[in-house]
């Protein structure tokens, strides 16, 4: 699937964009993408990456770091901004407000004006909570240079990832850090399952027919199982996604049971399918692309609305057909529906 996709896009770039350079298709796992970029659709033209520093700051006196240093499902990260000391106070305040919109409580930072002199050349509102050894370890970890600025974020995984991935994108664009014209990327090894926080039940991240990367892992922790699902990303935009499907009856049955589907329900809903698998099924998979989004990227436009003939409004109304509109009584009767008006 990936090989066919890569050949297809090499041809698209050559014939539509007249792009004759060799196209590089990068690959990154889902966990690596979250760890380095905070999202599963990074733009690799942007050199900014997150660095985990929980081990470095676990014993400092800064309460924000201490609160998350020992918590599960939490992160403490550092983000180096090249020549970030040139940012104004307003710039830093604007970035702080940006991450707050995504749940972050704030945005701590240190300025590395002269890294050879930690005592006087490194300044920060939180410096009094950090020893010189800790500061030096952070500088080494992110490979900071003179005039760089280092932002910090500490919170649960979701908030850190959501807020810092947006910050990476914003800073990369604002400071003109993007390198090259195109970034074509495969994101692989997505988790097979996730935990529904409301029901506390295991659910499929994609769908229950996605093949596990290693079927033997189904006997272990469901939340640690990787799948054979993949996304195709161009310049930080998800263009397509797909998976290799399950072709084994035994594996499919195990998946259903992990999802809490008992034998009776399994036979009622999927008996025909499991029976078909028992006769032998070749390995198979696929991918689906968002053509509208692809056109937007190829035309280097900022909004998908620009390439849709009759885009919906933000309230999902269609100005051309004036839909959605009310259904008449005959239409409702055909569907065995009735409307209930609010009193």
Regions inferred by a protein language model and the residue ranges of each:
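Class II aminoacyl-tRNA synthetase catalytic cores and aaRS-like
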Residues: 1-343
């Amino acid at each position: 699937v990936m090989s066919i996709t890569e050949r297809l896009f090499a041809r698209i770039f050559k014939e539509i964009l007249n792009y004759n350079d060799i196209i590089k298709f990068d690959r990154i796992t889902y966990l690596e993408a979250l760890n380095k970029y905070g999202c599963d659709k990074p733009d690799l033209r942007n050199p900014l990456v997150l660095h985990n520093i929980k081990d470095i700051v676990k014993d400092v006196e800064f309460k924000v770091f201490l609160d998350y240093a020992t918590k599960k499902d939490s992160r403490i990260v550092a983000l180096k901004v090249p020549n970030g000391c040139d940012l104004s106070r307003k710039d830093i305040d604007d970035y702080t407000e940006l991450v707050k919109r995504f749940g972050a409580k704030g945005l701590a930072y240190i300025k590395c004006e002269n890294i050879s002199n930690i005592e006087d050349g490194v300044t920060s509102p939180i410096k009094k909570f950090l020893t010189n050894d800790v500061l030096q370890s952070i500088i080494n970890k992110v490979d900071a240079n003179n005039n760089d600025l280092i932002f910090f974020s500490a919170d649960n995984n979701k908030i850190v990832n959501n807020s810092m991935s947006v910050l990476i994108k914003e800073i990369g664009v604002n400071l003109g850090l993007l390198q090259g014209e195109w970034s074509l990327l495969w994101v692989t090894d997505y988790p097979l399952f996730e935990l529904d926080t409301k029901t506390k039940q295991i659910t499929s991240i994609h769908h229950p027919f996605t093949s596990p990367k290693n079927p033997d892992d189904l006997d272990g922790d469901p939340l640690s199982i990787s799948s054979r699902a993949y996304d195709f990303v161009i310049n930080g935009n998800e263009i397509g996604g797909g998976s290799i499907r399950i072709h084994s009856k035994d594996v499919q049955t195990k998946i259903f049971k992990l999802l809490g589907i008992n034998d009776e329900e399994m036979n009622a809903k999927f008996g025909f399918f499991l029976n078909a698998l028992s006769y032998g099924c070749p390995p198979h998979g696929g991918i689906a692309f968002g053509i509208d989004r692809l056109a937007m990227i190829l035309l280097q436009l900022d909004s998908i609305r620009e390439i849709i003939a009759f885009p919906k409004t933000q309230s999902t109304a269609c100005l051309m057909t004036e839909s959605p509109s009310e259904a008449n009584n005959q239409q409702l009767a055909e569907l065995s529906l009735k409307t209930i008006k609010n009193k």
